[in-house]
């Protein structure tokens, strides 16, 4: 499913403007993804920075054949997922999803095509707390599908899981989220 992304070629060829363009194009979406999984703004920022560092190094070493088939966006999400998993291992525990994200971190609340506001943030807070109660695989699949709006083919490419597995994980994860949110103790479970 590779696509010829001219930016990948420019990065591999050492174009001095290409790294800035890559960061501008993908920073917010990768930050939002890492932030949803790590639940820690500084750790998410570190994860995204490490993602870009790894990407720049790898592209400089890849053979031409690899660059020809590289789908840049799923590849960056996969690097981010690997960096996040390393952070989880370093913590020697599951993702601390009981913590709540800072309400002032506007990048986290910026979702393409959405409206902002207190109701939106509150609904996301509830959803993200419930997201933390999913299995790691369901959490990753649901975040990629609904937080980052990736198609199933890109989720499969990002995670290395079969596309049907991704669909199943998302379906089961959404079902579990629905059950968790409908049982919300504050009466807000019907969102």
Regions found by a protein language model. Give the residues of each.
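Short, basic/polar amphipathic helix motif occurring as a linker/hinge flanking DNA-binding modules
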Residues: 86-111, 118, 187-190
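Short, charged helix-capping/linker segments at alpha-helix termini
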Residues: 12-21, 31-50, 64-66, 163, ...
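N-terminal module of bacterial RNA polymerase sigma factors
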Residues: 1-29, 36, 129-132, 154, ...
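Structural recognition of an alpha-helix C-terminal capping motif at a helix-to-coil junction
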Residues: 46-53, 70-82
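DNA-recognition helix of helix-turn-helix
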Residues: 81, 85, 124-130, 138, ...
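Amphipathic, Lys/Arg- and hydrophobic-enriched alpha-helical face
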Residues: 23-41, 58-61, 131, 176-183
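Arg/Lys-rich amphipathic alpha helix in sigma70-family domain 2
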Residues: 57-64, 77-99, 120, 178
């Amino acid at each position: 499913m590779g696509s010829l992304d001219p930016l990948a070629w420019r990065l591999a060829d050492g174009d001095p403007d290409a790294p800035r363009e890559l960061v501008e194009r993908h920073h917010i979406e990768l930050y939002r993804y890492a932030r949803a999984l790590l639940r820690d703004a500084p750790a998410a920022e570190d994860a995204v920075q490490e993602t870009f560092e790894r990407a720049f190094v790898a592209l400089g070493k890849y053979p031409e054949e690899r660059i020809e088939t590289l789908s840049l966006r799923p590849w960056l999400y996969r690097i981010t997922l690997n960096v996040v998993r390393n952070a989880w291992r370093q913590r020697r525990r599951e993702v601390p999803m009981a913590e709540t994200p800072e309400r002032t971190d506007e990048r986290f609340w910026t979702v393409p095509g959405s409206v902002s506001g207190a109701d939106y943030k509150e609904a996301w807070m509830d959803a993200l707390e419930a997201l933390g109660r999913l299995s790691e695989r369901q959490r990753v699949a649901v975040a990629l599908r609904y937080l980052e709006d990736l198609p199933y083919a890109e989720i499969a490419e990002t995670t290395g899981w079969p596309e049907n597995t991704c669909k199943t994980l998302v379906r089961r994860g959404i079902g579990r989220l629905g059950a968790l949110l409908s049982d919300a103790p504050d009466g807000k479970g019907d969102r």
